[in-house]
Amino acid sequence: MSNTSILKDMGSYKTTLLSALINSDDICELLFNKKPYDEDDVDNLVYTQIFPYLYIDETQTKVLTYLCFEVEIPRIPTGTIKDMKLIIWAYCHKDTMKYSKKGYSGTKVDILVDMVEGQLRESDKFGIGKLQLLSCTNFSPNNKYYGKQLVYNMPDFKISNR
């Protein structure tokens, strides 16, 4: 059986994005709402505050900030290229929207998506060329949380050897 697949890149891009997010000091500091933090703290972010799928816990008791992401292949226009989308959701409890950090402005969610966009802007690890930000829109997973949704386009070869 061949180790190549049209869909294989979805998982590999999630791994690459997860690594980029947890390796950003600014993003980790915002998610923890503290500095300093240690390596164990960062490892604990995955599947508690950073999810490789859209996560909304309606029964949560902790007030946290979340980053979720998904990779989609909405179409395959040619025999060699596939259109891929990277969707990132950043949201936090409405009671914790106030946040400040030098060099950034806006609410906690505004600052978080700015940090994420800055982390990804010049990356060449996704598809062919650089990621193209298509939209940044409001996102309300429930009545207590508010956030933003980033959508990136990333064309790639139909089958790659990642």
Map each language-model feature to its residues.
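Residue-level signal for secondary-structure boundary sites
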Residues: 77, 94-98, 158-162
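Solvent-exposed residues in well-ordered beta-strands and their adjoining turns
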Residues: 72-74, 89-93, 153-157
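Small/polar-rich, solvent-exposed N-terminal microdomains that initiate assembly or binding
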Residues: 1-78
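Short acidic, glycine/tyrosine-flanked loop/strand segments centered on an H-E-D-like triad
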Residues: 83-100
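Acidic-leaning, charged glycine-interspersed low-complexity segments
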Residues: 28-30, 60, 106-162
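A general secondary-structure signal for short beta-strands and their flanking turns/coil
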Residues: 62-66, 81-85, 143-149
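Short, flexible/disordered intra-domain loops and linkers
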Residues: 3-6, 98-107
